[in-house]
Amino acid sequence: MSRVAKAPVVIPAGVEVKLNGQVISIKGKNGELTRTVHDAVIVKQEANALNFRPREGFRNAWAQAGTTRALLNAMVVGVTEGFTKKLQLVGVGYRAAVKGNVVNLALGFSHPIEHQLPAGITAECPSQTEIVLKGVDKQVIGQAAADLRAYRRPEPYKGKGVRYADEVVRTKEAKKK
């Protein structure tokens, strides 16, 4: 039994929720998100909250209900507050710049990298070694940050590379003679 699914998702003022079978749309001041819910989950809107119940006949219904609750809660937070992800570039000559929807990276390769951001995500560079991604959809933000990090992951000897702002890179000791 999922303890997560038992807690309702509170719908704040200014957020509109539409239930159409298994398709749920959540609209707020930052935008609108839509998601199709798994068949094993029953979603009911009561007053200003969404409640979740498992449907009979599905083996993993409680697990799906907990997952659905977490996903819909992230959607509500996204359309009200939004999500941010911060990246740092550590290394000599590693730089970033943003032009429109394209992030230009200089990461020590023989060529510059131009990364096209997905729709609905904005990026800004407070400094040449920092990138801040903002958006409504938590999954898309995380994937965009992971794609940028994948160009040059932090290496374990000096820690150079693209890392999340809150990431702690464990460094190894150099080989001794």
Swiss-Prot record:
Described function: This protein binds to the 23S rRNA, and is important in its secondary structure. It is located near the subunit interface in the base of the L7/L12 stalk, and near the tRNA binding site of the peptidyltransferase center.
UniProt-recorded name of the protein: Large ribosomal subunit protein uL6
Domain of life (superkingdom): Bacteria
GO biological process: cytoplasmic translation
Keyword entries, A-Z: Ribonucleoprotein, Ribosomal protein, RNA-binding, rRNA-binding
CC per GO annotation: cytosolic large ribosomal subunit
InterPro entries: Ribosomal_uL6-like, Ribosomal_uL6-like_a/b-dom_sf, Ribosomal_uL6_a/b-dom, Ribosomal_uL6_bac-type, Ribosomal_uL6_CS
Pfam families assigned: Ribosomal_L6
Subunit comment: Part of the 50S ribosomal subunit.
Family per similarity comment: Belongs to the universal ribosomal protein uL6 family.
SUPFAM superfamilies, sorted: Ribosomal protein L6 (SSF56053)
A molecular-function term among this protein's GO annotations: rRNA binding
